[in-house]
Amino acid sequence: MSAAIRENELLIRACILYESLDDKPIAESYKNFCRKVGKDIMTLHDFDYWFYRFHNGNHDLYHDRSKDPKPKSLSDFPIGVMYDVLGHVDPFERLVLRKVSRNLRDVVQKMRCELDALYVNKENTCISIGFGQGTITYSQVDNGCQVDQWKSSSGYKKKFVEGGDFMELFNTDFRTLLENKKVILNSFDVHHYLLARNGTNEEQFLDHLIEIIKSSNKFTTRSFGIGDLSFDKIARFLELMEPKSLEKLEIGNIIGSTDYDHLVNTEQWKTLKHFISECVEISIPIDHLLHFTTMKVDLTELTVHDALKIRDMLDTSETFDYAMIYVKMTDPIEVARVFNPEYNNDDNQNRLFYYTNPGNKKFAIGSSKSMLSISDLASDYFAD
């Protein structure tokens, strides 16, 4: 295409008019236009304007676009309309829309937002936020931060923030997400790695995370999972969560102090229904575990005296369903005989027997030298 045509606005519009009359999809028409006229002549946004204007019968090549009525943005619509539209927007898009205008931010903050799952994952100089439908990943690279967004519905989008710091960008977006007081989570999980090996700004990351959650005032989630921390830091996280809403805690490896006193004295711990600490031995006394509806735990020890406390709990609890306790018992037969005086297991294999409490509620009990399981026969957790 000659330079004369490329610099003549009317001729360029005539080329678009020709494409609009060819009755092809706009994507194909734009590709053909770029091949003939040049890729740098017009953006798809501007091509779209003229293409559909001509396609709808408005063939005036001299039309002054600047005199068109200013198109309304979403934030110009009545509040009721904005609520209807934003009700169909996913968490990714709400995060972006909050930054568009004060009106949109105010509406998004007032809308109930229930997420099935939210997780934060940190590994060295990379942090991800996962919403279930996809992820946003912040990676520190040369001269800035690479932000990658993946959604199951639309695939990948990438953005480079020159001079950006991955942790600062994460902190900003995560804080923005939690500013909505009506965000309700079914589960929230924090994963972080390499703390035990090199501690690369892990403490700073965790402290920022605690500060952001704390600033959200009332952080509501039904389930919380975290690991590679001390009991004390886990307690600091728990204290930020609404105790009446938090039902389940799952912890991974314990690093640092194993002093459990702070943890077991939080209101959140005392009102938990479900607790999991598989694959990590904990030294929390059995007294602090007996209020759970279900639990799967690795304990450092389980004595006959502990078994008596468990039996007393079975005799009175109206909420207990299931317990799986992994432990290397020094006297497994005597522990089992707390529930069945005639129990005998010479080969130390897992044996199933039953215990009936004074209220005639029946429990299935499995016992071996390394495990004790208890199930209420009326609960969904029991299986033959």
UniProtKB/Swiss-Prot annotation:
Residues 71-122 form the F-box domain. It comes from the Eukaryota. PROSITE patterns: FBOX. It holds the Pfam family F-box. PANTHER family: DUF38 DOMAIN-CONTAINING PROTEIN-RELATED, UNCHARACTERIZED C.ELEGANS PROTEIN. Belongs to the FTH family. This is F-box A protein 224. It comes from Caenorhabditis elegans. The lineage of its organism: Eukaryota, Metazoa, Ecdysozoa, Nematoda, Chromadorea. The gene is fbxa-224.
